């Protein structure tokens, strides 16, 4: 159901950038792999991975406090790191650390990013509901190009995207 909902939203040209939260009690030992597979299957090109954090005043915070699973700090953390939490997880800490690091390596690998981008573009091209934008939007294409060209890895990824668009000229109309 979720995969079809994501495809439907993206078929109109929207880019979904979900929060990927790991560390739920219901997470299985395949959660990292399943999340990566889901991203490819539905062509998600962005997202924000992190660990579950119990925010003060929420039911989760109270539940973790009542069950002795809340890690209290002297000061409340306002800016957090991706791998920081205040919850004692049920899953093994080493499993979560290793799984998250492996996930990030694969998630940010240029080939994996390109695979997701290609799937996203293919879904848009197959769609009869795509609505192209008729303006530039908030970003400056020239500034974007400068950023891409300065960084070696970004430049390589950018060139892969351009090569894909050149090989499939019909895709260009979907991008523009």
Give the label of every model feature segment.
Residues 1-153, 157:
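A structural motif corresponding to the C-terminal lobe/cap of the Radical SAM core domain
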Residues 154-176:
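Long, low-complexity C-terminal extensions of enzymes
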């Amino acid at each position: 159901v979720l995969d079809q909902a994501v495809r439907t939203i993206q078929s109109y040209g929207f880019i979904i950038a979900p929060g990927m939260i790991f560390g739920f009690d219901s997470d299985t030992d395949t959660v990292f792999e399943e999340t990566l597979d889901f991203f490819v299957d539905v062509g998600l090109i962005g997202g924000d991975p992190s660990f579950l954090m119990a925010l003060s005043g929420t039911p989760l915070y109270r539940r973790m406090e009542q069950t002795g699973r809340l890690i209290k700090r002297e000061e409340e953390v306002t800016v957090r790191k991706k791998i920081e939490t205040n919850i004692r997880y049920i899953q093994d800490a080493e499993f979560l650390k290793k799984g998250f690091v492996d996930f990030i390596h694969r998630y940010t690998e240029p080939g994996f990013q390109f695979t997701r981008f290609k799937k996203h573009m293919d879904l848009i091209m197959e769609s009869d509901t795509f609505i192209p934008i008729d303006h530039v939007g908030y970003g400056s294409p020239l500034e974007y190009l400068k950023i891409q060209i300065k960084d070696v890895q970004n430049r390589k990824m950018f060139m892969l995207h351009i090569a894909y668009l050149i090989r499939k000229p019909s895709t260009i109309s979907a991008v523009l």
